[in-house]
């Protein structure tokens, strides 16, 4: 059983439907025991980093997530969920994240329209099994105003939006997707299909 973490913010139903379409055994839960018993964790999210991390802290889920990931359990963060994986965010102040990936979440300060909303193509930087069913330059759907600023060693794919915007990242058993795979058609499903194979092997 793979658990979609319900902390009060997130596109839970659409993420759940996407995984179920791929016949992944998923459950939405906010119970610590379910997270501990899960095969892997899925961290969705829509909204502000500050609100999300406060809800995770208040519910006691922050420490459980860190403990389970430290044991080697896979986690994938989607959209805001990916941003929560980083050390800190500068959205509406300065807030500590889960600290599972080095780097910080910063405002996407570009001359283009912000939020970065709509379809953009992916460029690959590192090979990884999560990319096995897609080709470079396939389009996925983004909605965000902040992005992950890091040394980019964890970046597997990025979108060019005047800046290099990390789109898929990975550090050991921690994966993150900045765009919405559940809204990205066949390309998004193919990414989740590849991730399914990673967590079920």
Question: Can you say where each PLM-predicted feature lies in the sequence?
Answer:
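N-terminal beta1-alpha1 ligand-phosphate binding loop
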Residues: 2-24, 181-183
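Short acidic low-complexity segments
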Residues: 26-37
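Structural motif
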Residues: 42-44
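Cysteine-nucleophile active-site neighborhood
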Residues: 47-117
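Pocket-forming structural segment of enzyme catalytic cores
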Residues: 88-163
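Short, surface-exposed beta-strand/loop micro-motifs that present aromatic residues
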Residues: 163-170
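Acyltransferase
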Residues: 177-201
